[in-house]
Amino acid sequence: MADEINNQEVQPEFHIQRVYTKDVSFEAPNTPHIFQKEWQPDVKLDMDTKTNILADGVYEVVLTLTVTCKLETETAFLCEVQQAGIFTIGNLPEPQLAHCLAAFCPNILFPYAREAVANMVSKGSFPQLNLAPVNFDALFAQHMAQAQAQQATAEA
């Protein structure tokens, strides 16, 4: 019986404790005259994630979305959302933990952040903005490949 317990694999642990909005900001510096212009926006999305260790196996992940919308040279609006979550993660080796924190957790947070951006843009009286889904796994793989290339260059 004891051998059966010892031979069982330790299962990974993942729990969402909380998802919350940490910070929001919306600026429309060139209103109301910007509403008179033909709407052909140049929309730029910047994303960032940060991880804070809160306790052993407890992490805060913060996804920041910054959307800048310009008409020609004038800023129509600037919208920033910090969507955060507290996650309990255990029994994962380091490479999988890094992937979980950098890709899996932001993937959970993104729909909340996207909704917050869409609501603020709409309340600013601008046309609807629907941000496309983001492949955080691909971004993580790209980041890891860049880090490996930089390490190889540094060692050469």
UniProtKB/Swiss-Prot annotation:
Keywords: Chaperone, Cytoplasm, Protein transport, Translocation, Transport. Disulfide bonds: none annotated. GO terms for molecular function: unfolded protein binding. It is found in: Cytoplasm. It holds the Pfam family SecB. The keyword Transport applies. Its main location: cytoplasm. One of its GO terms (cellular component) is cytoplasm. InterPro entries: SecB, SecB-like_sf. The keyword Chaperone applies. One of the proteins required for the normal export of preproteins out of the cell cytoplasm. It is a molecular chaperone that binds to a subset of precursor proteins, maintaining them in a translocation-competent state. It also specifically binds to its receptor SecA. Belongs to the SecB family. This is Protein-export protein SecB. It comes from Aeromonas salmonicida (strain A449). The gene is secB.
